[in-house]
Amino acid sequence: MKYKDLRDFIQRLEALGELRRVTQPVSPVLEMTELCDRVLRAGGPALLFEAPPGYAFPVLGNLFGTPRRVALGMGVDAGDDAALDSLRDLGRLLSALKEPDPPRSLKDAGKLLSLAKAVWDMAPKTVSSPPCQEIVWEGADVDLHKLPIQTCWPGDAGPLVTWGLTVTRGPNKPRQNLGIYRQQLIGRNKLIMRWLAHRGGALDFREFALKNPGKPYPVAVVLGADPATTLGAVTPVPDSLSEYQFAGLLRGSRTELAKCLTPGVDTLQVPARAEIVLEGFIYPQDGTPAPAPAGAPPRPAGQAAAAYEHALEGPYGDHTGYYNEQEWFPVFTVERITMRRDAIYHSTYTGKPPDEPAILGVALNEVFVPLLQKQFAEITDFYLPPEGCSYRMAIVQMKKSYAGHAKRVMFGVWSFLRQFMYTKFIVVVDEDVNIRDWKEVIWAITTRVDPVRDTVMVDNTPIDYLDFASPVAGLGSKMGLDATNKWPGETNREWGRPIEMDAKVKARVDRLWQDIGL
């Protein structure tokens, strides 16, 4: 099933019993978070809040709160197990696009050409009179306070845009970048753009500031895109492929785009059927900025991007389950808001796992497996436990072939995808350990690990900025545990032989089990 826009997806979810309309008044200040959190933990449906008090826009929450709904958003209409299998197929497609195998025959060459043609055929197309521009607010009419932007936790600094797809472009780059960055509301037309230094939007901005000092940087933020585009923005798409193109592959039809209306921002294109679009700029700092408040970190300095308007962001409750510290980020000034008639505001919250990002992580885990196996054939399975705050812990199952092999795999995973620079802990086990069962993983650690021999510590590596356990923001250490059986050269001891019952005895007890009535 393919969905041309968010409304199409909502209709399908409702038909499947995967969406519930909430007609009672529920406030976007704390109440939506509490209700969505309870529903997500119970494996419940997406929620469409139709009557947020004081607002004219319904709010969509918990949209990707189960792996099945993530798979549905990618066009896979199946139960949870089949959906996860289909996500592995998606990973195989991505691995083929990222690093295609050389053809070994004319038949293989034909398959490669067919894949290349499929990608080319999904190039996005621009349309005129798009639905996302049916209503336009500009000038004094621009007021972000009219949108039901959630305040998620009691200690949050204010309302927070959470599901905005931020569209940017670097200088002289044909490809646009889509990224999801939280944005703090600080005024009628101002948001703080919290993008970390290594993310695509921040890289585009820094490159622009270096090449065009003193010029406003155009940005668009999309709220309520079709599910394929939204999920394309969080999937490890190869650099040679745009997220819009990838969304077309998921959807089975070319992504329809519209040029932004604001002069200077009209170099950017947004999904034509999006619910709401914010258009504007990050402006250079006007005059001398006020000094940083007492106790706050120093203002950014020494880079071209530092000459642009910045504000102190946070604190906010985050996916770690804690409030993060404050930091300076660029200010996005919204000059125009366009939207569909009867627009829907798409939102979420982040908190102690499980939350929606954790569920997305479970689903995307299945996409990562074929990508890793393409690079490291010895990896037989890979798991990012949701309790590990998305990417902070990874369990790797492998077919070990030589002494030191597990350590090679650790360093390979850390350096493979940008997402894995956040991974603090890697545990490597053999094929006989079910990595999705903590009891088996703990058994392997406690019986196959010597802390001195089998622990790898790596210092001064990139780390999640939100990881307050690291000694320096954005820089910390990593730890690997080799919980595999040890080979000659790794131990001088006779290695333990696992206990296993005789197969004939097990078969007899299987028959007895039924006779006894157990």
Swiss-Prot record:
Binding-site positions, prenylated FMN: I180, Y181, R182, R194, W195, L196, R199, G200
User: Which residues constitute the catalytic centre?
Assistant: D318
Q: Which chemical reaction does it catalyze?
A: a 4-hydroxy-3-(all-trans-polyprenyl)benzoate + H(+) = a 2-(all-trans-polyprenyl)phenol + CO2
Q: In which pathway does it act?
A: Cofactor biosynthesis; ubiquinone biosynthesis
Q: Which residues bind Mn(2+)?
A: N177, E243
Lineage top rank: taxon:
Bacteria
UniProt-listed InterPro entries = UbiD, UbiD-like_C, UbiD-like_N, UbiD_bacteria, UbiD_Rift_dom
Task: Give the UniProt subcellular location, in the record's own words.
Answer: Cell membrane
Tell me which cofactor or cofactors this protein depends on.
prenylated FMN; Mn(2+)
**Cellular component terms (Gene Ontology):** cytosol; plasma membrane
Q: Identify the EC number(s).
A: 4.1.1.98
Report the principal subcellular site: membrane
Q: List keywords of the entry alphabetically.
A: Cell membrane, Decarboxylase, Flavoprotein, FMN, Lyase, Manganese, Membrane, Metal-binding, Ubiquinone biosynthesis
Which PANTHER family is this protein grouped with?
3-OCTAPRENYL-4-HYDROXYBENZOATE CARBOXY-LYASE-RELATED (PTHR30108), FERULIC ACID DECARBOXYLASE 1 (PTHR30108:SF17)
Assembly and interaction partners = Homohexamer.
Role this protein plays: Catalyzes the decarboxylation of 3-octaprenyl-4-hydroxy benzoate to 2-octaprenylphenol, an intermediate step in ubiquinone biosynthesis.
Concerning its family, UniProt says:
Belongs to the UbiD family.
Q: What is this protein called?
A: 3-octaprenyl-4-hydroxybenzoate carboxy-lyase
> Per the UniProt entry, what species is this protein from, by scientific name?
Burkholderia multivorans (strain ATCC 17616 / 249)
